[in-house]
Swiss-Prot record:
Catalyzes the irreversible NADPH-dependent deamination of GMP to IMP. It functions in the conversion of nucleobase, nucleoside and nucleotide derivatives of G to A nucleotides, and in maintaining the intracellular balance of A and G nucleotides. One of its GO terms (biological process) is purine nucleotide metabolic process. SUPFAM superfamilies: Inosine monophosphate dehydrogenase (IMPDH). Its EC number is 1.7.1.7. The gene is guaC. It holds the Pfam family IMPDH. The lineage of its organism: Bacteria, Pseudomonadati, Pseudomonadota, Betaproteobacteria, Burkholderiales. Belongs to the IMPDH/GMPR family. GuaC type 2 subfamily. The keyword Oxidoreductase applies. NCBIfam families: GMP_reduct_2, PRK05458.1. It comes from the Bacteria. This is GMP reductase. GO terms for cellular component: cytosol; GMP reductase complex. It comes from Polaromonas sp. (strain JS666 / ATCC BAA-500).
Length: 325
């Protein structure tokens, strides 16, 4: 198996078939809806809040609300009142089952539910998927996070409608250092490996540092890409604004950090400061334009045409003929 990450790979251009990049369609379908771009902000407290989620939904983007210090029932009611879809996160503990029961009692069903735990290839996840499929069969269930083909096969067989791939590649994740496990440093290879066995959508989660990494993720099998740090330093980001030497930053921390947990126990995340770099709308528009450019370089007109592009591994022997054919 080839081992590489985003910075080690470049995609090879194919003959352009459009007169303008704006002709390229960066849209992607997930769970019966089509979204403008294959990007979803990380479901973290310093990346998304209710206002950002509502704006994303109204403007044709996918979102997943975080699950920390949140009344999920009220959140879904608020989203329904605004006339937009609801997309929430759940864990696998008793309060999460209670939340599902509350939805059933109220006759409410979020359109999307993400089972969001650090090690998603688990019996606890299997039980939660089964419970959701029984109680809220209309909801589209995303489950994760995982790192191996075996895990993707299991989650799909258990009933997940999509899987989230990536353990520890994020900028504020220290799972690799704390545990010795994860996809940090080879996330793109892990994605390729998992996508080979997947029959349902994969959301690549973590390790995205540049907009070009979105296209690389699509090329190696992702349907959607979850991004934290690039969307944490925006004017609207919910993280606390901090001034250092006259420059403005946003606080950004991992979901398993002591900053998020409020206690120093089983910590696998850290806190950093992200420079403020513009607005959400401008950033997403730039991402869309860059993805359109990627599609044109791939010789395509729609997002999945990127998968037809060949690639080279920088520093590798590139001996496989398929790379350059």
């Amino acid at each position: 198996m080839e081992i590489f990450d985003y910075e080690n790979v470049l995609l090879l251009p194919r003959k352009c078939r459009v007169e303008s990049r704006s002709e390229c369609n960066a849209g992607v379908a997930l769970g019966g809806r089509t979204f403008r771009i294959p990007v979803v902000p990380a479901n973290m407290k310093t990346v998304v809040d209710e206002n950002i989620c509502a704006w994303m939904a109204k403007n044709g983007y996918f979102y997943v609300m975080h699950r920390f210090d949140l009344d999920n029932l009220q959140f879904v009611k608020n989203m329904k009142a605004k006339g937009v879809y609801a997309s929430i996160s759940l864990g696998v503990k008793k309060p999460d089952y209670d939340t599902v029961d509350q939805f059933v009692a109220e006759g409410l069903a979020p359109e999307y539910i993400t089972i969001d735990i650090a090690h998603g290839h688990a019996d606890t996840v299997q039980r939660m998927i089964a419970y959701l499929k029984q109680k809220l069969p209309a909801s589209f269930v995303i489950a994760g996070n995982v790192a191996t083909p075996e895990a993707v096969i299991d989650l799909e067989n258990w009933g997940a409608d999509a899987t989230k791939v990536g353990i520890g590649p994020g900028k504020v994740c220290i799972t690799k250092m704390k545990t010795g496990f994860g996809t940090g440093g080879w996330q793109l290879s892990a994605l390729k490996w998992c996508a080979r066995v997947a029959t349902k959508p994969i959301i690549a989660d973590g390790g995205i540092r540049e907009h070009g990494d979105i296209a690389k993720s699509i090329r190696f099998g992702a349907t959607m890409v979850m991004i934290g740090s690039l969307l944490a330093g925006l004017e609207e980001s919910p993280g606390k604004t901090v001034e250092v030497d006259g420059k403005l930053f946003k606080e950004y921390y991992g979901s398993a950090s002591d900053f998020n947990k409020g206690e120093y126990k089983h910590v696998e995340g850290k806190r950093i400061l992200e420079p403020i770099k513009g607005t959400l709308a401008d950033t997403l528009r730039e991402m869309e334009e860059d993805i359109q450019s990627s599609i044109s370089y791939a010789g395509g007109k729609k997002l999945m045409d990127i998968r037809k592009a060949n690639y080279v591994i920088l520093g590798g022997d590139n001996a496989g003929e398929h790379l350059l054919m």
